[in-house]
């Protein structure tokens, strides 16, 4: 685990995992924090973010809920997300806090807007140089459109191809695309897993086992 010390670790949590009564998420977060890995959670919506903050804090950790307007973290650009400002995330994680981000933008003029949590998680992972980006999905990974068997590993190019395949469930395509773009932006690896599986957040760090689908491979980091 020493190779991951001081690194950001982004978890895109879905509603199934956020409200699971027997979830090991809080103990996984404690484990990561105890090894100086810096988790950042992206919730599916505001109510799930509030629930996660309560659950994490009741377990003895220190979680802080954030919206996109906090420190202008998630600036709105057109109808989407602009270049994020990760300073507040870095300040919190460096001081032992676990940020829980709700996917809302900051609009300097007009109303803030809802953002897609997969897009937010990918952008945060890239901006914080995260060692991992984990996307929770009830399917537990990416099924092969031809056989329905879960795919163990994909390159970013393969993942982007599947993200455009209409045979793949629509709500999974966003996670696949975000995982691929995160890796292309410099994240070492991204996983799509079922967040309800025990210790799914950390098993890949400790073993060579993939519990879902991993996206890794060529990295294309582009400058501003």
Give the ranges of each region predicted by the language model.
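C-terminal catalytic "cap/lid" subdomain
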Residues: 1-224
């Amino acid at each position: 685990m020493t190779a991951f010390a001081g690194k950001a670790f982004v978890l895109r949590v879905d509603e199934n995992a956020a409200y699971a009564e027997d979830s090991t998420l809080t103990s996984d977060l404690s484990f990561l924090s105890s090894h100086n890995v810096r988790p950042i959670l992206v919730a599916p919506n505001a109510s799930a973010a509030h629930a996660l903050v309560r659950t994490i804090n009741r377990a003895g950790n220190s979680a802080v809920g954030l919206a996109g307007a906090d420190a202008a973290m998630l600036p709105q650009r057109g109808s989407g997300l602009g270049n994020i400002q990760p300073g507040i995330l870095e300040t919190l994680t460096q001081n032992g806090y676990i940020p829980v981000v709700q996917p809302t933008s900051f609009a300097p003029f007009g109303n803030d807007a809802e953002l897609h949590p997969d897009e937010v998680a990918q952008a945060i992972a890239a901006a914080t140089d995260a060692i991992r980006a984990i996307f929770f999905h009830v399917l537990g990974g990416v099924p092969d459109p031809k056989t329905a068997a879960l795919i163990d590993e994909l390159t970013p190019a393969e993942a982007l191809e599947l993200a455009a395949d209409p045979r793949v469930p629509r709500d999974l395509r966003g996670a696949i695309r975000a995982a691929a773009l995160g890796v292309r932006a410099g994240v070492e690896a991204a996983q799509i897993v079922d967040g309800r599986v025990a210790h799914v957040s950390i098993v890949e760090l400790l073993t060579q086992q993939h519990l879902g689908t991993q996206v890794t491979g060529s990295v294309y980091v582009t400058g501003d």
